Regions:
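N-terminal periplasmic "start-of-domain" segments of outer-membrane beta-barrel proteins
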Residues: 10-23
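A structural signal for short secondary-structure junctions
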Residues: 56-59, 70, 346-351, 360-366, ...
Length: 447
C-alpha cells in the first residue's frame, strides 16, 4: 500500500527511496524487500535499516523502513617514521553523504619530511631537507544525478614526491598536477549489480634529478604530459560494506594513455580484482581475493619520446602506500624490481592472491579479527611464461606471508586496523633470504 521512511535525520528521503526495489502497488515480495535492505545498507550511511511490515487490510500491507544514521563524515589521519623520510603524516576529510544528498566530497593531504633522515642523493638544485612526499587532492561525485542511474564526478590533484634515495619513492623530485572528470552508469545487463565509469584525465609531470635517474625513471624527460581515458567495470553484490558475509566484488579497470590522445606518456594498463565472501560455521567468514595487472608501452602516434611513468607501473609491499598494492610481512613497496640502491622502479606485471579467515567480535560498532595468508609479486616482463623454467624467477615466484590482524569501525575513530605478518621470502640488502615479522597500522577519525 504505502512505504514510509523514518529516522533519516540527515539523509534526504529520495536518497533512500531510489535504492528500493519494491514500490507502492507492487505485489508483496520478501526477496525484493531483502534486496532493498541490502541496497540501503550498502550506502554505508546507516548503522541499521529495519523494514517493518504493517498490515492494513486482508490483502494490503504498509512497509515502514526505520533507519539509524551513522556519523556524517570521516576525518582521517596517519603518522609514521622511516629512516629516509623521517616523520610522515597526513590527513583528510571525506563526506560520503554531502549535504544529505548521497553525494561524496573529499579532501586529503599527506606530507613526509626527512627530519632526522638521510639522503643518498644531494642534487645541486634541491634542498635535502625539503619534504620528499607531499600530496593534496579534492574530489566530488554525485552517484545518481537527479535520481537517475547516471554518475558525474571530478577531481583535481597535486603531488610532489622523491628527491632522495628511499625505499618508498623515486630518487627524482617529481611534481605532478592535473585533474579529471568522470561519468558513470548503473547497468541493466547482465544484472543491476553491474556499473561502469569512464574518466578523462590530464596531468603534467615535472622531474628533477641526475641524468642517470632521469633516464631510469622518466625516459630522460624533465617534463611530460599525460592524457588518458580509463574505463572501470565492476559488480558488487556483497551484503554489507564493513563486514561482508556473502557475495562478491569484481572490478576490471583499463587505461589508455597517450597514443591517439597525445602527450608523451603512452601505454595501456589493465587491472583485474576479484573478491568473494563465503560464510562457514557460526559467524566465521572465508574471504578470497585475486588481483592481476599488466601494463605495456605504446609507440607515440605523433613521434618523439614515449615512456611509462614509473609510478604508473606496479609496486607492491607492506602497507602499499601510495601505490595501492599491499603485501603484509614485507617492506613497504619493497616487492618487485628494484634499483641497485634498492629503490622500487616498478614492474609491468603483477599478481596477488590472498585468503582471510574473519571472525566478528562485535556488530555495532563492527570489530573483527583476521587470520591471513597471501602471496604476490611484480615482474619487469609482460610475459609470465618467459622465465618459467628458472627457479625463483618465473610466474610461480610469489612472495608468501601469513599473519593476523584486527579491524575496528568505531564512531569518532573510524577505521582502525593492525596487522602483523611474517614474510617467508623476504630478501635482505645482500640478496640473502631474511624472513621476519612486519607490522602495519591504519587509522581514521569520524565525527
Amino acid at each position: 500500500n504505502q512505504i514510509a521512511i523514518i529516522g533519516n535525520t540527515r539523509t534526504r528521503e529520495n536518497v533512500i527511496r531510489r535504492q528500493l526495489r519494491i514500490f507502492p502497488g507492487d505485489v508483496y515480495s520478501q526477496e525484493r524487500i531483502a534486496r532493498s535492505y541490502r541496497e540501503v545498507m550498502m550506502l554505508n550511511f546507516f548503522a541499521n535499516a529495519t523494514p517493518n511490515i504493517l498490515p492494513v487490510s486482508e490483502d494490503k500491507v504498509d512497509i515502514e523502513i526505520a533507519v539509524e544514521e551513522k556519523p556524517a563524515g570521516q576525518a582521517s589521519a596517519n603518522m609514521g617514521y622511516t629512516q629516509s623520510l623521517g616523520m610522515t603524516g597526513g590527513g583528510g576529510l571525506a563526506l560520503p553523504n554531502f549535504r544529505g544528498k548521497g553525494q561524496s566530497f573529499s579532501f586529503s593531504f599527506n606530507i613526509g619530511t626527512n627530519i632526522g633522515g638521510s639522503d643518498s642523493y644531494n642534487y645541486q638544485n634541491l634542498n635535502s631537507n625539503q619534504p620528499k612526499y607531499r600530496t593534496a587532492s579534492i574530489s566530488f561525485t554525485d552517484p545518481m544525478v537527479n535520481d537517475t542511474k547516471n554518475l558525474l564526478g571530478g577531481s583535481i590533484f597535486y603531488r610532489l614526491q622523491g628527491g632522495g634515495s628511499t625505499a618508498y619513492y623515486s630518487p627524482l623530485l617529481t611534481t605532478l598536477a592535473g585533474g579529471s572528470v568522470m561519468w558513470g552508469r548503473i547497468f541493466k545487463w547482465p544484472d543491476d549489480f553491474f556499473r561502469g565509469t569512464w574518466s578523462f584525465q590530464m596531468a603534467r609531470r615535472i622531474n628533477q634529478g641526475t641524468e642517470e635517474d632521469l633516464d631510469n625513471y622518466a625516459g630522460g624527460m624533465k617534463q611530460s604530459d599525460g592524457i588518458s581515458l580509463t574505463q572501470a567495470i565492476r559488480r558488487d553484490n556483497r551484503d554489507h560494506p564493513e563486514f561482508p558475509t556473502i557475495g562478491s566484488h569484481f572490478s576490471l579497470n583499463s587505461t589508455l594513455s597517450g597514443w591517439l590522445l597525445g602527450g608523451q606518456e603512452n601505454f595501456h594498463k589493465h587491472t583485474l580484482n576479484l573478491e568473494w565472501y563465503t560464510p562457514t560455521f557460526w559467524k566465521f567468514v572465508l574471504t578470497n581475493s585475486f588481483k592481476f595487472g599488466v601494463i605495456k608501452e605504446l609507440p607515440s602516434k605523433y613521434g618523439g619520446i614515449s615512456f611509462i611513468p614509473y609510478n604508473d607501473r606496479f609496486i607492491m609491499g607492506g602497507n602499499g602506500i601510495p601505490y595501492g598494492n599491499p603485501l603484509r610481512g614485507y617492506d613497504d613497496n619493497g616487492v618487485g624490481p628494484l634499483t641497485n640502491s634498492l629503490n622500487p622502479i616498478g614492474g609491468n606485471t603483477m599478481v596477488k592472491i590472498g585468503t582471510e579467515f574473519r571472525v566478528p567480535f562485535a556488530e555495532n560498532p563492527v570489530v573483527y579479527g583476521i587470520l591471513f595468508a597471501e602471496m604476490g609479486n611484480v615482474w619487469s616482463s609482460n610475459d609470465l611464461m618467459e622465465r618459467l623454467n628458472l627457479p625463483r624467477r618465473g610466474p610461480m615466484d610469489l612472495k608468501r606471508s601469513a599473519g593476523a590482524g584486527i579491524r575496528f569501525f568505531m564512531p569518532m575513530i573510524g577505521k582502525l586496523g593492525f596487522d602483523i605478518g611474517y614474510g617467508f621470502d623476504r630478501i635482505d640488502s645482500n640478496g640473502e633470504l631474511d624472513p621476519e615479522w612486519k607490522t602495519t597500522l591504519t587509522f581514521g577519525q569520524q565525527f
